[in-house]
């Protein structure tokens, strides 16, 4: 069982190592676990690695769940997080007392923050150690409101942000080059760009696709969470079973924490989670810091000639900030000084977008026919 094979030995080892300070009270609690009184949590994250089970299933031959919020099915990670919360049983979710709390309150509640390094293959899992895309579906109003809020936050930070308001997942007629941030819903399996083997996200991208069973399997490419890990994600979310929208990780809270409050994605993920002892998992290196090299430092590197295929996106982000204060013409002029001096397919496209109509058409035609971007899965959306 989960208690015998996973939780009990993990907690016992953490106490033995001093990672958890706790007094044994004798006997067992109502769930049959050793009765412990925790007094101090001495670690930031418990990291589960590939090979540790991710879901607890009691479904067997059950055809349906009578009470949708009272089921013993849950994620291993979430149950471990809630180990020291008072619970009458493992059935159902319990409120996360650290939800929308942005400091160290989680320690005073004796919560265990859990992250996971897991993916389809071991090499994908090891890979876990400035564009944004918001893919709405109109499946339910709360989800779309979360995405709208996330989009506003990303735009305010200068990220080149595409919002797709169609109910289907972003198609090939939508720009989707080098995604550094992606939030979307609601498709049952990875499709469109995410189903192209040659397509990959920007290194260390952040985001996820909201779907009830996105992490039902972490070894199958037909589920969203492992596919994100395989395509360069450094921070992604998943649900091992049906969580119901109100109990899933809040995209808008997460985006505000990471991009406005400058928290680590792992910190933001826990603050954005309304419930524990439930279905959610977080996959990524808990120490990953997307703010380590701020935009100003990225621009300084470019000025020194230290560029790569993604440098153009730092310039585009800065151009978006220039456009807010000085207008599109100033932003286009800024980008033109870098044209041809570094990989610039997206940069040329952005200049076209910022330019007057006639120049826009000429630049777009040059991209389409001279560079044949419709043959490149990374840039086909620019066509």
Show which residues each predicted segment covers.
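Start-of-helix register in tetratricopeptide repeats
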Residues: 313, 346, 377-381
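Cysteine-dependent hydrolase recognition
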Residues: 1-336, 341-344, 358
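Mixed-charge, low-complexity intrinsically disordered regions
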Residues: 343-346, 364
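Primarily a tetratricopeptide repeat
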Residues: 333, 363-366
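Alpha-helical linker/edge segments of TPR/alpha-solenoid repeat scaffolds
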Residues: 356-363
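"A position-specific structural signal for the A-helix of alpha-solenoid helical repeats
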Residues: 317, 349-350, 354, 381-383
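Solenoid-like repeat scaffolds
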Residues: 336-342, 367-376
